[in-house]
Amino acid sequence: GKKFKVIGAVTQLGILGCDTNQWNDKVITKNPFFCPDKSMIKLWEKYLLNIRKSGSSCGAVIEVRARGIPTGLGAPIYSKLDMDIASAMMSINAVKGVNIGSGMNSAQLSGEQNSDEIFQKGKKLKFNSNNAGGILGGISSGQEIIASFAVKPTSSILTTRKTINKFG
């Protein structure tokens, strides 16, 4: 059968996001940040060093891409593929948000901007975009499935914070 591939990468470190249009699978495992955009690595090194020196921490966004996934996985109700992916991602400790495709950013788009137009090229169906993240109506569309999740900054930091104990 057709082979599929799943790959993940860190696409944002604190306030510094990378250009996911510059995604390069080969770069991901060749840097300590698992960043797919080579141009961000030095910036992230400096940024994280400053965060660490200040005694603080930062969050991150991890994007997962699945290629070669057959059309038709999932269901329109109850067993939606995007629901299952979001549930699995939310079960990871420290995850505070999940996006499928354009996710939260789709709220800023018009219907025309967000819709993934389909056209025929030869005998194959193609899409002009992938805002839906490869899932339409809970069912895989045959496009690359793209999902991301946000991880909160660790609360184990060196800076003084107000808290309470059993005495108040």
Give residue ranges: language-model regions:
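Glycine-rich, mobile lid/loop segments that gate access to catalytic sites or pores
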Residues: 1-77
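Catalytic/RNA-binding core of pseudouridine synthases
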Residues: 42, 167-168
